[in-house]
């Protein structure tokens, strides 16, 4: 049950970020906000894309 819930959440996230992804995503080391999911890698740690 946990797995399917996780993938559903992930899918929803990807849907929500598709627009910003298609315009431009930030590279590794770029400053980012965890809430905006704007990194190419998808991971934002300590204010930087990982």
Curated annotation (Swiss-Prot):
TM segment ranges: none
Q: What is the effect of changing residue 27 to G?
A: Small decrease in ability to inhibit Cav2.2/CACNA1B
Its keywords, alphabetically, are: Amidation, Calcium channel impairing toxin, Disulfide bond, Ion channel impairing toxin, Knottin, Neurotoxin, Secreted, Signal, Toxin, Voltage-gated calcium channel impairing toxin
Q: Name one GO cellular component term.
A: extracellular region
Per its record, what are the GO molecular function terms? Answer: calcium channel regulator activity; ion channel inhibitor activity; toxin activity
Please give the residues making up the propeptide in this record: 2-24
In the UniProt annotation, what is the result of changing residue 46 to A?
No change in ability to inhibit Cav2.2/CACNA1B
* Signal peptide residues on this chain, from the entry's feature table: 1
Tissue expression remark: Expressed by the venom duct.
Which top-rank group of organisms is this from?
Eukaryota
Q: Does the keyword Secreted apply?
A: yes
Q: Which cysteines are joined by disulfide bonds?
A: 25-40, 32-44, 39-49
Primary residence: secreted
Site note Key residue for inhibiting Cav2.2/CACNA1B applies to 27, 33, 35
Q: Which InterPro entries match?
A: Conotoxin_omega-typ_CS
What does the annotation give as the result of altering residue 33 to A? Answer: Important decrease in ability to inhibit Cav2.2/CACNA1B
Question: Which effect does the record note for changing residue 30 to A?
Answer: Small increase in ability to inhibit Cav2.2/CACNA1B
What are the Cysteine amide sites (modified residues) in this protein?
49
Q: Where is it located?
A: Secreted
This protein's domain notes: The presence of a 'disulfide through disulfide knot' structurally defines this protein as a knottin.
Family label: Belongs to the conotoxin O1 superfamily.
Please describe what this protein does. Omega-conotoxins act at presynaptic membranes, they bind and block voltage-gated calcium channels (Cav). This toxin selectively and potently inhibits depolarization-activated rat Cav2.2/CACNA1B currents (IC(50)=89 nM), when coexpressed with alpha-2/delta-1 (CACNA2D1) and beta-3 (CACNB3) subunits. In vivo, is lethal to fish and displays potent analgesic activity in mice pain models of hot plate and acetic acid writhing but has fewer side effects on mouse motor function and lower toxicity in goldfish.
The UniProt record's further free-text remark is:
Shows very weak activity on Cav2.1/CACNA1A (27.36% current inhibition at 10 uM) and Cav1.1/CACNA1S (2.82% current inhibition at 10 uM), and no activity on sodium (Nav) and potassium (Kv) channels in rat DRG neurons.
| Stated name of the protein | Omega-conotoxin Bu8
């Amino acid at each position: 049950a946990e797995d399917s819930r996780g993938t559903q959440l992930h899918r929803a996230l990807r849907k929500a970020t598709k627009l910003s992804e298609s315009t431009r995503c930030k590279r590794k080391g770029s400053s980012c906000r965890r809430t905006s999911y704007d990194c190419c890698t998808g991971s934002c740690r300590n204010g930087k894309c990982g």
